[in-house]
């Protein structure tokens, strides 16, 4: 069982933190490399558990994957894939069941090879995350999809066919899967009510580089199928969720952090909320500087919604800040129905939180106290680390392996700015 030990010294975090490439961008782009018959070189790739899991899945199909490392065995953040000789069409069950993004391989596999076998995807336990919209859209495009227990067997006679598809609700994963499936389909596919997150725009940019014909107009995406896709070199966008998490670390500890490698436009929907709770967000020499304006953290009312609104992936971390804010804050979770598991753990630190359906009310208190905590998913682990930075004494976070699915070397980055965090197996 992996553990994180945080010793609070009430020290404001001060320093510089380099923001890595986006977890939510690299995974669909790695899946999209299946569409290419040539090698693909990706830069700014974060060294995360999920990236290694996706690499295993690609290699299991016959792809060559090289995640280059320096002499000290640390990743230099360049990954090369070669999917020119795929010889297996069954995605590894055990690995796929650990990784939500494994389902994004279905569209590319069907589009290029006409067949695929996979498992229902894994990932964080944050409530129902159905794949019915993915399946429905692929069936509309001509795929035959059968469910056999936990397995999904998909085939198509000939090529997938372009269709007009309207998503019943905005879905990042469904939008990505349909776009990838449509790139090698016959005819034109139009997606209405598509998600427009920066990570999707990065996927589209990558697909265009390898030869896809894609146009986007607000929430409408139009893909004209082509016969073949090639290789390219592409740099992954920076991780806005990682940036937002470290920004909150500065605010919670009343410190000052310089976030390098991220543009303000990348995190505007997050920065707006940070400014509302009393953060000062400044630009300096191409970086973003985060600190408190003055005094204490302000309470807020916020709802998570699809981009460009406040992201669900930042909700747990914001809740940690609200635990020590002035007044009562209300957070409404509109994306996932089971994303308040961190509230029980924050209460162990002394936080005053009440939950009613999809709303959490947080009555801010002056201080938190260290405790023995149990993490349940990626973002909740990050939230517990943030709260532990200002909890008196020592805090132990069990099941902390979740953190490495989305944050590269978080403890090292925070320690370089004054935190006292250690890791045990």
UniProtKB/Swiss-Prot annotation:
Its main location: cytoplasm. It is found in: Cytoplasm. Phosphoenolpyruvate binds at residues 23-24. GO terms for biological process: cell division; cell wall organization; peptidoglycan biosynthetic process; regulation of cell shape; UDP-N-acetylgalactosamine biosynthetic process. GO terms for cellular component: cytoplasm. Disulfide bonds: none annotated. It comes from the Bacteria. UDP-N-acetyl-alpha-D-glucosamine binds at residues 100, 313, 335. It catalyses: phosphoenolpyruvate + UDP-N-acetyl-alpha-D-glucosamine = UDP-N-acetyl-3-O-(1-carboxyvinyl)-alpha-D-glucosamine + phosphate. Pathway: Cell wall biogenesis; peptidoglycan biosynthesis. The active site is at 124 (proton donor). Transmembrane segments: none annotated. Pfam families: EPSP_synthase (PF00275). It is an enzyme of class 2 (transferase). GO terms for molecular function: UDP-N-acetylglucosamine 1-carboxyvinyltransferase activity. Its EC number is 2.5.1.7. The modification 2-(S-cysteinyl)pyruvic acid O-phosphothioketal is found at residue 124. Keywords: Cell cycle, Cell division, Cell shape, Cell wall biogenesis/degradation, Cytoplasm, Peptidoglycan synthesis, Pyruvate, Transferase. SUPFAM superfamilies: EPT/RTPC-like (SSF55205). Belongs to the EPSP synthase family. MurA subfamily. Cell wall formation. Adds enolpyruvyl to UDP-N-acetylglucosamine. This is UDP-N-acetylglucosamine 1-carboxyvinyltransferase. The lineage of its organism: Bacteria, Pseudomonadati, Pseudomonadota, Alphaproteobacteria, Rickettsiales. The gene is murA.
């Amino acid at each position: 069982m992996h553990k994180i030990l945080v010793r609070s010294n009430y020290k404001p975090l001060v320093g510089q933190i380099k923001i890595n490439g986006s977890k939510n961008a690299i995974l669909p782009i790695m899946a999209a490399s299946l569409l290419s018959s040539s090698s693909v070189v990706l830069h700014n790739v974060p060294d995360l558990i999920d990236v290694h899991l996706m690499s295993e899945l690609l290699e299991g199909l016959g792809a060559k994957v090289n995640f280059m490392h320096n002499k000290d065995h640390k990743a230099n953040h360049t990954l090369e894939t070669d999917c020119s000789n795929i010889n297996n069409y069954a995605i590894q069950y055990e690995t796929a069941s650990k990784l939500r993004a494994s389902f994004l391989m279905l569209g590319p596999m069907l589009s290029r090879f006409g067949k695929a076998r996979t498992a229902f995807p894994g990932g964080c336990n944050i409530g129902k995350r159905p794949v019915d919209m993915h399946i429905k859209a692929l069936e509309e495009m001509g795929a035959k999809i059968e469910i056999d227990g936990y397995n999904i067997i998909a085939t198509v006679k000939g090529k997938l066919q372009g269709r007009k598809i309207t998503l019943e609700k905005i879905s990042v994963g469904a939008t990505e899967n349909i776009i990838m499936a449509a790139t090698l389909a016959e005819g034109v596919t139009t997606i209405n009510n598509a998600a427009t997150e920066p990570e999707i725009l990065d996927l589209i940019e990558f697909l265009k580089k390898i030869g896809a014909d894609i146009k986007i107009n607000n929430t409408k995406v139009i893909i004209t199928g082509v016969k073949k896709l090639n290789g390219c070199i592409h740099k992954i966008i920076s991780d806005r969720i990682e940036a937002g998490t470290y920004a909150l670390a500065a605010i919670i500890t009343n410190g000052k952090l310089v976030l390098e490698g991220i543009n303000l436009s990348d995190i505007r929907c997050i920065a707006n909320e940070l400014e509302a709770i009393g953060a000062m967000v400044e630009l300096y020499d191409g970086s973003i500087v985060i600190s408190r304006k003055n005094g204490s953290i302000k309470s807020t009312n916020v709802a998570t919604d699809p981009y460009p609104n406040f992201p669900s992936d930042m909700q747990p971390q914001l809740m940690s800040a609200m635990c020590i804010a002035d007044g009562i804050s209300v957070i409404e979770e509109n994306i996932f129905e089971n994303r308040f598991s961190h509230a029980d753990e924050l209460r162990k630190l002394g936080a005053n939180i009440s939950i009613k359906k999809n709303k959490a009310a947080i009555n801010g208190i002056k201080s938190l106290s260290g405790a023995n905590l149990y993490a349940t998913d990626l973002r909740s682990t990050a939230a517990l680390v943030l709260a532990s930075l200002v909890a008196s004494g020592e805090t132990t976070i069990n099941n902390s392996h979740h953190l490495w699915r989305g944050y590269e070397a978080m403890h090292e980055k925070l320690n370089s700015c004054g935190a006292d965090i250690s890791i045990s197996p």
